[in-house]
């Protein structure tokens, strides 16, 4: 039997336009479960493995304070990303019985997770990150142990960081220090390997260039793109298309592309399971548009 995995997510305010497509990509990973804490109601697209936990932003913060002892009361839901090193402890009841837990953003479209994160990979590691130098806050996996659920307690400044009004990268940069050679969790078996799934990242593409594929096809659970033929990818992280929050001084041509669209979603999600769909700077469109050349932008 494959190691079991539960992924923790949260979203407060209003669902992103692509939520139904996010759920569809989760649905095609049926033996992985997502727990999403939200005040947004239930998406139209229902999946047995996507478990919506209805909770207000205020009540979620109160839960975090009660479980961790922190005293911070952030105003912005985005600040909750800094809580991720504590989420295993905060949600210990929901993830009880799973071999692994993880955390994940909702600006991610998944391919076949177990096609890349194999049983052998799970069995040989305690922590799986998809970036080489940080814990990938948008999707990372940890063995479900007391030590890792309470890893935030090994960060003396955790409560101090949570009091900073802006996101402080506790979940990726600061968390990663625990797994460095001199870190408190250096004894654990970690895999920090770039999976090339965050487009427009300054790390560059796997061919050593900054020429990122711009058209991605999701179909029947498989995620491919316009540059790499049949090669499948773990997920696509559209952080740099959906906003300019992380843009460099001179952004790439398609950075923040979705902020300039009248509509991000231009395809009926009810057809996604049957027909697939394309993800690109043009938004979410019919699968047939994935065959166009990147130069068409």
Task: List where the protein language model places each region.
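A short, conserved acidic/glycine-rich loop-to-beta-strand motif
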Residues: 123-139
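GT-A fold catalytic core of metal-dependent nucleotide-sugar glycosyltransferases
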Residues: 83-127
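Catalytic core and acceptor-binding pocket of nucleotide-sugar-dependent glycosyltransferases
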Residues: 148-297
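Short glycine- and hydrophobic/aromatic-rich loop-to-beta-strand nucleating segment
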Residues: 138-146
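N-proximal low-complexity "stem/linker" segments adjacent to membrane-targeting elements
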Residues: 1-20
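Active-site-proximal specificity loops/subdomain of glycosyltransferases
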Residues: 39-94
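Short catalytic/ligand-binding loop motif for oxyanion handling, primarily in non-cytosolic enzymes
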Residues: 43-45, 62, 109-113, 118, ...
